[in-house]
Amino acid sequence: MLRALVRRLVPIVVRRAVWRVRRNVPRIAQPLSFVAPRASPPERPIFVIGCPRSGTTVLLESLLRSTQLRSIHNEGHILWQPHHHPRDRGWDSDRLGAGDVGKREREYVYLAVRMFVRGRRFVDKTPENCLRIPYLLELFPDSSFVFLRRRPAENVSSLMEGWRARPRFVTYRLPERLDGLGPLSGPNWSFVLIPGWRQLRSAPLEEICARQYIACNEEVLEVRDGIDPSRWHDVAYEELTAAPLETIRSLFERLGLAFGPAVEEHARSLTSRPSFTTLSPPRADKWRELNGPEVEKVLPLLAPVGRRLGY
């Protein structure tokens, strides 16, 4: 509630300035990594992954109510983005593989995490990590993953809301224009930069969002079966919102975390209080009200991955 109030009262220019400061704090570890003793990988980190607008922020906020967990006060991509910004790789995409981990990068990331989590388990939520699971496994060999899935129509509609909420959620200023977005046309890209984005430069918004949903979820499904089931935890957005207390308690048990009073209180509040990133109150068939005709056009495109996800 307090965070939502601050968001309403504080001008976005001020919030963005504060965000830039917070974004750069973990980078203090970069020069220190050259002189500090070598840090070991954090033990059993937890990565919350899922397509943008699938509810990953809600899940992260719930996990951070645990006294056993700590994040770096921002999405984890700020740790490795200096090493792997898309502009340094021909603006290809946000995808990274195991071979992309560098020696100096490894020492810097380990030190930065150790500085900020201070003995607790590291937890992170970064939607781009849907495209980076092999990279994360190379950096953090004993990591666990919490994969949040959401029904295709609802998720794509929420992505469309996010794209329209400029300047929020803009991730990159591309070297080439997007020309099929009407008033949103231009070089700005929101959320995950997916492989093959250049083929979408003339595509309408609903197709870009559908392709983001497909790319994020298909990448996860391709690698999921190769990970020890004890380190992989599926959560459905629909279950999280319909029965948050039971869903979060079950997840905490699977992750070996204590389900304390603060966690329980937060879980109970989710039925009435959406996340601070929620753009409009949740309700049944909201996607039909907001973006029905557009989303219906891409439902055939979404159907195969939706079936693989159990929808």
What do these predicted regions represent?
Residues I46, R70, S144-V146, H233-V235:
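Hydrophobic/aromatic beta-strand patches that form the interior of the parallel beta-sheet core
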Residues K125, L136-G162:
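Conserved phosphate-donor/acceptor-positioning beta-strand/loop module used by diverse small-molecule
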